Each structure stands twice: as structure tokens, then as C-alpha cells.
């Protein structure tokens, strides 16, 4: 059995990372505290933590075949995924699969900030791309 600890972050696909970063930092007042390129996922991300430790994650593709680049081409900018922080990602994946949830990732992989991540297929989540994640330091 696993436990959901919090909404970890909301991932927003953007065409211009600097514009997005400036909006969330200067207009909304949630400063960017980290920027990272995750080569394996062909994405650059920025993180804007809120006082309750949930974050806004901005994502931009770094290649034409990046899932984020393809997402923006198909659907435009906007919310791309919601991530839930879990206490044990391996248990979460096993429990979800046992309940018939279709997983994009049947094993955790490493995402931004070194988090262990896995995605649930939108066909199992009523159309929402849902990420589960586990952080060593949270």
C-alpha cells in the first residue's frame, strides 16, 4: 500500500521558458529557484515553489521529438501534467497496476531534481496525465 503525501507540482508546457519564468516570478510572485535540463526526457524545466511546498514546473522541449514539443504542437501551451508526491513509488506502481491502472512507466525513472518518477496513462485517469514522484529529501 502507498500513501499520497501532497500535490507535488503542476507541469505547464511553454513555448518560451524565459517569458514563462518571468510571468510566474514577476507577475504572480513565485520566484524560480531551480532550472534543469533533463537530457533523457529532452526537456528543460524551471521550478517555482509555493509556500506549501507544491511547485509550478515550467517545461520546454529541447528537441523536435521531445514529448513537450509534440504536446505544444498538438494542444498548445498549458497544463501538461499533475504530479502527486508518494511515500514509496515502487509500492505505488505495484498497487496501481494491481488495481488495473495502465502505466506509461512500469518502473520508476529519474526525473528533474533526482526524483523517482512514473506516469499513469491518461486512459486510466479520465484524460489527465498523472505523474507520481518520490523525493529523497522531502
Where are the predicted features?
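N-terminal beta-strand motif that seeds the catalytic metal site of vicinal oxygen chelate
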Residues: 1-19, 77-86, 134-138
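Vicinal oxygen chelate
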Residues: 2-3, 46-49, 56, 84, ...
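Short, structured motif recognition centered on aromatic/hydrophobic residues
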Residues: 7-14, 24, 48, 53-59, ...
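Amphipathic alpha-helical segments
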Residues: 18-31, 97-99
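Short glycine/proline-centered loop/turn elements that form peptide/ligand docking sites
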Residues: 19, 37-41
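Short secondary-structure junctions
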Residues: 29-37, 101-107
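A short, acidic/glycine-rich surface segment
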Residues: 43, 65-70
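Mid-chain, well-packed structural core segment of small domains
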Residues: 71-99
Amino acid at each position: 500500500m502507498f500513501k499520497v503525501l501532497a500535490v507535488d507540482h503542476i507541469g505547464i508546457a511553454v513555448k518560451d521558458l524565459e517569458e514563462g519564468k518571468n510571468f510566474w516570478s514577476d507577475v504572480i510572485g513565485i520566484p524560480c529557484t531551480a532550472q534543469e535540463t533533463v537530457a533523457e526526457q529532452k526537456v528543460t524545466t524551471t521550478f517555482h515553489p509555493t509556500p506549501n511546498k507544491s511547485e509550478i514546473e515550467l517545461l520546454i522541449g529541447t528537441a523536435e521529438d521531445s514529448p513537450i514539443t509534440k504536446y505544444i504542437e498538438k494542444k498548445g501551451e498549458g497544463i501538461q501534467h499533475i504530479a502527486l508526491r508518494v511515500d514509496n513509488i515502487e509500492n505505488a506502481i505495484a498497487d496501481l497496476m494491481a488495481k488495473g491502472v495502465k502505466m506509461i512507466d512500469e518502473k520508476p525513472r529519474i526525473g528533474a531534481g533526482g526524483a523517482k518518477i512514473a506516469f499513469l496513462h491518461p486512459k486510466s485517469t479520465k484524460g489527465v496525465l498523472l505523474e507520481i514522484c518520490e523525493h529523497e529529501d522531502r
